[in-house]
């Protein structure tokens, strides 16, 4: 499940249609009851993971703290900790992506998350990120580094087609590789294609071609260590041709919630996706990859839930296809 807790954000990315400021139409901070309702429906639908996303450091935006006060919290971190606890109690494993974070914030969240993530996007200084204090590459790399020091299973990724060069992509992949070789915590790297959004500064910017995406996937598979998966989003690009180039993971597919970052792109049905892939088998995993399940890279707080949901290989006990069929019974 994809739960966008708030879309209020200090960054002003040139391609983002998700961000709002307090007082703007569509600006929101989800109330606890809203989140709890989605979590309960998720359990009934057979979900195992909730992705909590946030605009980055919304507290820096005037008016946001009043919204927090209205739901009884003094900080976004305190609210997020409550939501993670609630998800675990409901039977869902949290995965948090809230932008750049300090070591102390990561330490607080580690026991309550199966994994966490932050898109590097690019090591290049880009026009798309000119008004984005959280998109300074060194700051993002530092967050990823601190997660490694804390042994948090981690997701990162590149955003393809936002003004970076092929050499920038290689440099970005090498930066992620360097951190993984030092700490061993990168589960997967997402190779995500830019998709223009109406009303944004980059609404007329060209999308990357399929050939560009193929090349980016090939680069990722060549540069990244073999134990790091390469992922693409099947709601943004047809994955079949990319699997032959090195893609090994298709990310999360929600039966309940939309992709709030790319709301125009519907999730594929799991069974339709399997038909499209033909003899390429799908196997469902948890938000923590099998190798990290086997290593015990999780806290006591979520240990019993991971053990209940995982098989002896570290994957999910019941395949996704069976779950989809069960929902119709």
UniProtKB/Swiss-Prot annotation:
Residue ranges of domain Radical SAM core in the record: 1-235
Signal peptide annotation: none
Pfam entry (one): Radical_SAM
SMART domains, A to Z: Elp3
Domain of life: Archaea
Cofactor note: Binds 1 [4Fe-4S] cluster. The cluster is coordinated with 3 cysteines and an exchangeable S-adenosyl-L-methionine.
Recorded GO MF terms: 4 iron, 4 sulfur cluster binding; 7,8-didemethyl-8-hydroxy-5-deazariboflavin synthase activity; iron ion binding; transferase activity, transferring alkyl or aryl (other than methyl) groups
The keyword Metal-binding is assigned to this record: yes
Cofactor(s) of this protein: [4Fe-4S] cluster
Pathway: Cofactor biosynthesis; coenzyme F0 biosynthesis
Keywords tagged on the record: 4Fe-4S, Iron, Iron-sulfur, Lyase, Metal-binding, S-adenosyl-L-methionine
InterPro entries, A to Z: Aldolase_TIM, CofG_family, Elp3/MiaA/NifB-like_rSAM, F420, rSAM
Catalytic activity line of the entry: 5-amino-5-(4-hydroxybenzyl)-6-(D-ribitylimino)-5,6-dihydrouracil + S-adenosyl-L-methionine = 7,8-didemethyl-8-hydroxy-5-deazariboflavin + 5'-deoxyadenosine + L-methionine + NH4(+) + H(+)
Keyword Transmembrane: no
Residues at which [4Fe-4S] cluster binds: 9, 13, 16
Subunit description: Consists of two subunits, CofG and CofH.
Function statement: Catalyzes the radical-mediated synthesis of 7,8-didemethyl-8-hydroxy-5-deazariboflavin from 5-amino-5-(4-hydroxybenzyl)-6-(D-ribitylimino)-5,6-dihydrouracil.
Name of the featured protein: 7,8-didemethyl-8-hydroxy-5-deazariboflavin synthase
